[in-house]
């Protein structure tokens, strides 16, 4: 497989995306049925960097190729990767799993929902990034999640992040331990100017929570 860009106006990161041999075989069969010389697939992410992120694939005839796409040449077809989607497709794997009903194409993209932040990002953007990239993956194991409500400049306590816990974290009796030892520590490590982290969620209301 070779990787190239079709134009110099492309993203700086080279896509680290894998299409497994079984997926290549399956896609080759689909593309062959299109009867279009040079047809390939285009890979992109809708709503990248958000909880609603969705990885997508579409047919791409030669005349439909976007000039800024990255091109990955596989033995039987080309794959074109949407340049703005590249950071969200790092370490992505497209696979095909056969079963008695035929099979299923799967798309695993661990970075598709992780927000990207630059050097000029606001503190809200930086906090959201840490929550999505570092904290929520751990909370997900307990069926929980955490989101930023707001950042307050408290006269008494300084810069304060107000968080909302949901899912399995809502109603959890160990929330104080979780918040103080885990979430707050991690946020302060990444954002030194943050002085305090507080929980907006009322953990006395266990209805709708996984842990009661």
From Swiss-Prot:
Alphabetical list of InterPro entries matching this protein: Fe/S_biogenesis_protein_NfuA, FeS_biogenesis, FSCA_dom_sf, HesB-like_dom_sf, NIF_FeS_clus_asmbl_NifU_C
Cofactor: [4Fe-4S] cluster
Keywords (A to Z) from UniProt: 4Fe-4S, Iron, Iron-sulfur, Metal-binding
Binding positions for [4Fe-4S] cluster per the UniProt entry: 169, 172
Keyword tRNA-binding: no
Any one GO BP annotation for this protein: protein maturation
Subunit structure: Homodimer.
Function according to Swiss-Prot or TrEMBL: Involved in iron-sulfur cluster biogenesis. Binds a 4Fe-4S cluster, can transfer this cluster to apoproteins, and thereby intervenes in the maturation of Fe/S proteins. Could also act as a scaffold/chaperone for damaged Fe/S proteins.
UniProt-recorded name of the protein: Fe/S biogenesis protein NfuA
Organism: Acinetobacter baumannii (strain ATCC 17978 / DSM 105126 / CIP 53.77 / LMG 1025 / NCDC KC755 / 5377)
